[in-house]
Amino acid sequence: MLNIAFRNEVERRIGLDEGRRNRMYLDSLGIPTIGVGWNLQRDDTMHALAYCGVTDAVGVISGKVCLTDAQVDKLFAYSFAPIESDARTSLAPGVYDALSDARRFVVLSMRFQLGEAGWLAFSNTRGLINEAETAKLAGALDRAHALFMLVGDHLATSDWYTQSASRGVRNVTMMRTGVWVTA
């Protein structure tokens, strides 16, 4: 998939998974959230809202003021900017870029959903992804397949999976198979 097509698909899928709301709401963990999964408790919320052209940040945070669609788009772009570089550096050199588009999406989705520290806590999973893709690149396809299945098993037994409902099921399937699952 071309870079622009991949980026558009990533944005579409994350938007479906996270939802898109112009007014503050409480997410599944009770965290004040807005836009496409923006945690309003983040340290950089005031800066991000100002960057998006918000003039009443306190009103937005309290739920009294809504963001415009353009502000939601800009906030998502701001929040997504570091995600791909974080995902790339969280894996062994060359592994992220060698993954299938579906597997790269799973890594991006988890990094977006969990934050950097949350994604980095999946050290065994990341190690298995490194090992699986390295085996695939070396032509050891049976070993790579078995390792990607194991990655899926690790994810499916995590708290992330339990809390992620249909997103977790789709992402585990994509990690195991390397192909897109309908969203």
Please identify what each model-predicted range represents.
Residues 32, 101-108, 149, 169:
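Non-catalytic, well-ordered alpha-helical scaffold segments
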Residues 21-26, 88-100, 124, 148-154:
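Surface-exposed patches in mature extracellular/periplasmic domains of secreted proteins
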Residues 9-19, 106-110:
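Short, functionally critical alpha-helical segments immediately adjacent to catalytic or ligand/cofactor-binding
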Residues 2-7, 91-102, 139:
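Short, mixed-charge amphipathic alpha-helical segments
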Residues 50-93, 101-105, 109, 114-121, ...:
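Alpha-helical segment that forms one wall of the substrate-binding/catalytic cleft
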Residues 10, 28-30, 103:
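Residues that flank catalytic or metal-binding motifs in active/ligand-binding sites
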Residues 28-57, 80, 84:
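Substrate-binding/active-site groove segments that recognize
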Residues 1-2, 8-12, 38, 116-183:
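Long, amphipathic alpha-helical surface segments
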